[in-house]
């Protein structure tokens, strides 16, 4: 923009693009030898302005400079804020965020782009409930998860968060996409009971960890791990926010040739069951790979079950075959379980 102290034609076009009314002198900008000279006779010499023209030119030029620098500062601030949103997290993928920003308005359309997720609740909600009740002493059939605190990671518009809240749990839903949280907040506001039980936050899992170490009875990451950047770090964070003995629930897509053909080619490109670009096959993870990450990080795999979606009926079913979708339940070891046999004797 500046060449040898002169504002180039490219710089002029940039100012005009920003909507500035540049002085006519910009067409032939004066040479500036010192940016510290902004007053008196020295300014008239540096800008090559005649003394009797100094007042008008000074006002016009300084006004343009102030506007330009102010605008550039704001642009730099916005750019820094945009980067900060993602730089604070090593698990959030900015490309994935942009994909779901464009889909935020569709969350609660049961016949729309997220219809398979609505239908998946028929499997994943009982899966979470039943496994949590194995270690629960609560016998309230109306609110079986009462007294439990659950973290729903990547909650989106709250499709799974709300059913868990209706079962009596206190649920915190987090998502890096502000548009998703806005939709979720709006939807829960129609139910006064859910409005009290559910909290939503625009943040990453790492940010939640800073204030919620060993705070949750369960962490849910449903259809999330295939979208994160650093899976091992993600699992480590899940472990750290769980109470000893807490449960981690994951539903995701296996990394197989069949999942590529049906999960991406057919579902996204041919049938349009899910929007194009929703999934990246390289990020799919097999049950074996997932277990190899969970176990060294203190999470013992209790259950792995296959799931299959019928696009014609719109329903999900359990299956022994995990080559497409599957659900996993892992448990963080309790404190006493870490003791050596000699110590626990």
UniProtKB/Swiss-Prot annotation:
It is found in: Mitochondrion inner membrane. Belongs to the class I-like SAM-binding methyltransferase superfamily. UbiG/COQ3 family. GO terms for cellular component: extrinsic component of mitochondrial inner membrane; mitochondrial inner membrane; mitochondrial matrix; mitochondrion; ubiquinone biosynthesis complex. It comes from Rattus norvegicus (Rat). Coiled coil: none annotated. This is Ubiquinone biosynthesis O-methyltransferase, mitochondrial. Its EC number is 2.1.1.64, 2.1.1.-, 2.1.1.114. It is an enzyme of class 2 (transferase). Component of a multi-subunit COQ enzyme complex, composed of at least COQ3, COQ4, COQ5, COQ6, COQ7 and COQ9. One of its GO terms (molecular function) is polyprenyldihydroxybenzoate methyltransferase activity. Residues 1-86 form a transit peptide. It is a peripheral membrane protein. HAMAP family: UbiG. S-adenosyl-L-methionine binds at residues 124, 154, 175, 222. Gene3D superfamilies: Vaccinia Virus protein VP39. Its cofactor is Mg(2+). One of its GO terms (biological process) is ubiquinone biosynthetic process. The modification N6-acetyllysine is found at residues 143, 149, 196. Pathway: Cofactor biosynthesis; ubiquinone biosynthesis. Its main location: mitochondrion. O-methyltransferase required for two non-consecutive steps during ubiquinone biosynthesis. Catalyzes the 2 O-methylation of 3,4-dihydroxy-5-(all-trans-decaprenyl)benzoic acid into 4-hydroxy-3-methoxy-5-(all-trans-decaprenyl)benzoic acid. Also catalyzes the last step of ubiquinone biosynthesis by mediating methylation of 3-demethylubiquinone into ubiquinone. Also able to mediate the methylation of 3-demethylubiquinol-10 into ubiquinol-10. It catalyses: 3,4-dihydroxy-5-(all-trans-decaprenyl)benzoate + S-adenosyl-L-methionine = 4-hydroxy-3-methoxy-5-(all-trans-decaprenyl)benzoate + S-adenosyl-L-homocysteine + H(+); a 3-demethylubiquinone + S-adenosyl-L-methionine = a ubiquinone + S-adenosyl-L-homocysteine; 3-demethylubiquinol-10 + S-adenosyl-L-methionine = ubiquinol-10 + S-adenosyl-L-homocysteine + H(+). Keywords: Acetylation, Magnesium, Membrane, Metal-binding, Methyltransferase, Mitochondrion, Mitochondrion inner membrane, S-adenosyl-L-methionine, Transferase, Transit peptide, Ubiquinone biosynthesis. Mg(2+) binds at residues 223, 226-227. Disulfide bonds: none annotated. SUPFAM superfamilies: S-adenosyl-L-methionine-dependent methyltransferases.
